[in-house]
Every structure is written in C-alpha cells, then in structure tokens.
Amino acid sequence: PRHIEVQILAGKNNTVHLHERDCSVQRRHQKLIEETPSPDLNDEIRKELFDKTVKMVSKIGYEGAGTVEFIYEDEKFYFLEMNTRIQVEHPVTEMVTGIDIIKEQIWIAFSGETALKQSDINPRGHAIECRINAEDPSKNFQPSPGTIGMCHQPSGFRTRVDGAIFQGYKITPYYDSMVCKLICHGRNRTEAIQRMNRSLDEFVIEGVTTTIPLHKKLLNHEKFLKSDFNVSWHKKKKII
C-alpha cells in the first residue's frame, strides 16, 4: 500500500484542504521522503479523497491545522489517523501552494476562522522533502551522535533547508535523529528530483553519519523514478 495524507485548515466558518502528500518511502514505518502531488493518484480519486476528508473534519468540528492520514491500495483509501498538529513534511505543501501553514494556524487560533476559501488554493508544480537523519543505514539505521564538523547547506532557486545545524553543533543520542529537512520545488516531478539531486550533492555534514547518501540512491532508483513503490519498498529492496 501507499501512505497518503491530506493537509487541512479548519475554522468555525469552513474547512479547506491543501491537497495531498505521498509519504510512502519509509523505514521502520517512519517517513524518509515526502512529495506532493502524489504521482499515484488521478484527479477523480483525488476529488473523492478531498471531499471525504473535508466532510469528516467538518463533521467533528475540528479547528486548526491538521493532517488526515490514509493507507491507499487498489484505488481504495483506509483511514489511519488524524494528526492535530503541524507535520514534519508540511513544507512540501507550502512550496506548491505558496501558503504559510504556520501563519494560517495562528490566524485560526486567534480568530476562530480560516482566512482562505478553497478557490484560493491552487497548487503549482511538484515538491519533494528529504529528512536528513544522523544515523547509519548500513547498520540498521543506528543513531550517529557526535559533533558536526564542516557543514555546508545547499541553497538556490526553489530550495529550502529547515533546521538549525552548524559547525560545532552537538547531536546527542537522547532525541530524534532528524537534524534537518531539505525541500526542493520544481515545475514537475522530474525537475524537483533533479533539483533535489543537485542539493544533496552540495550538502556537506561531516563528523556524523547521515542519510544523505541513502537519499541519493533512493531518488535515482528506477522504482522511485517510475513511482513504482509502496511503504515496504525500501525494506524489501534493502537499499542502503
């Protein structure tokens, strides 16, 4: 199956969706790569998914930003959970919609209403996020704590890094292994992948082992390029 989720913003006045994210590239049931739009959905299936999601969220009277997650298989969706918070992968949605989800969440908390109508939301292009973790894929994703040496982050057109790492930054073994997120946007999926490849090549983090080399392999794998994968793809193929 695939892991598909829908970003929503809901207030007393109305509920809007910010389209879907595909989070099917995972390890240990945790996301590695997220993208939007999902390359596996058609417009008819999208409409059905969005309509049911908005109806569900409106029915329970939810207010704020949230994400409704589904398992998708054989053109059928199965409800998984709703996360009543900002997701790690929210930047891909921001990149394609141009909407600051944090700002909108604060506005809803302040006013009780959404400032957006569904007609205001018109996604453009394709965005991909890679979670950069301090862990060793060759050792079953063993954490790699330590002190960061040289650190050079990529930059450029439609490229975004969310994180706070720097030379001398200490990564402890006590918390989540993710150290930053790399997000790239393109006019289409091919361009987004190309931009992500360039950005990963530019990214330098010394002193600890990271998942940067793994992301390069995943992004350029034939199965990923053809969107022929599911939540167990990485484990079955043993890509490290």
Predicted regions, residues:
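ATP-dependent carboxylate activation and anion-phosphoryl transfer catalytic cores
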Residues: 1-240
